């Protein structure tokens, strides 16, 4: 049967106290609205409409790669009005429409699939995802008849005293027969405490028309909506625990899973060991048998097999097999580091290529450079790539030995099999096989200290 989805994302989220729309706040590295869109797509719902309102352009920009359509809700008149604004999306469609909220990012793929199967198998006009909670304050209540069939949903502010005692709550997520939903939307009224058009009223309307109403209980954490920074932190903690559990089940060792921060969609190979304090962001891919000692940040990078990283930052770069990075290294965007390379303490590499088996052991800056294989950089080497206006290129050939405290003033080329003497400032090309010395000769002035009377 055909199915589609509407995601409600027009709410302003005033309790977030933010200048950006609520649904654009991130959970584990991804905007909440995109988390919801992605999980809906994984549940095999491809036709998705997002209802947007104030700041609509920001939401559209954040979701434009998701191939969704959009409806606009100009005034915040309730969830029923929001779905009504998507009428053009539903026009001439037959089948099932699922309705989700863009601020409920914890719903699971299997739950959505189960809801669709449950709805279709039961022949329901509407199906509600519900949950049983001990403290239902603030949630709409599921009111059932004596035979346990769903009668209606009553919003918290409209509940009678006995209805307030009900523990089964509405998650705000549903699926409907499309034709039944369209007919019912025109019948809802705003005669309630909020003066809004509730989507929940559709349930009672369908019931009165003889339609069957289904209710599928799910774990409460999946129903959690995010309306404040506190709830955002709570949702992120739940999602982070899910992510970490999946990686551990797939063969990754997390020494302290409560203090390891892995974004959604990160890939990590088996037998990798991760110590606490590490942060993995963006679309990072990590190979097998890697070790991440405490307190590194890896963002949108590819880390190949058998890499060791210690207390370092790697941004939008690629690290080859059997390489070690850190401690206190800084790998900046557009860097490619080869196999069996050593990037040591207080080394910064920016927009450069480092060949296989090269050693950059400590206190070095390499920027806008192409470095060959089997090179060695002495302590204090600086690639001087910026002249105040432009960034210039440095080329360093294979098997080059760069002595300590060397400046390579770009643009400059150092050919294969060369040596550069410590303390040199290199401004000209170094021929293959040459030793370059670019420093003043040492002068010793005998007895100078005593003649000056500095010491007796």
Swiss-Prot record:
Active site: 362 (proton acceptor)
Pfam family, one: Hexapep
Keyword set includes Acyltransferase: yes
A cellular component annotation (GO) from this entry: cytoplasm
GO molecular function, one term: magnesium ion binding
Keyword Acyltransferase: yes
Entry note: cofactor: Binds 1 Mg(2+) ion per subunit.
Entry coiled-coil feature ranges: none
GO BP annotation list: cell morphogenesis; cell wall organization; lipid A biosynthetic process; peptidoglycan biosynthetic process; regulation of cell shape; UDP-N-acetylglucosamine biosynthetic process
Binding site for Mg(2+): 103, 227
Positions that bind acetyl-CoA: 385-386, 422, 439
Annotated spans, Linker: 230-250
Cofactors that this protein relies on: Mg(2+)
Key words, A-Z: Acyltransferase, Cell shape, Cell wall biogenesis/degradation, Cytoplasm, Magnesium, Metal-binding, Multifunctional enzyme, Nucleotidyltransferase, Peptidoglycan synthesis, Repeat, Transferase
Ranges where the record places region N-acetyltransferase: 251-456
NCBIfam families named in the record: glmU, PRK14354.1
UniProt subunit comment: Homotrimer.
Protein name per UniProt: Bifunctional protein GlmU
Organism field: Clostridium kluyveri (strain ATCC 8527 / DSM 555 / NBRC 12016 / NCIMB 10680 / K1)
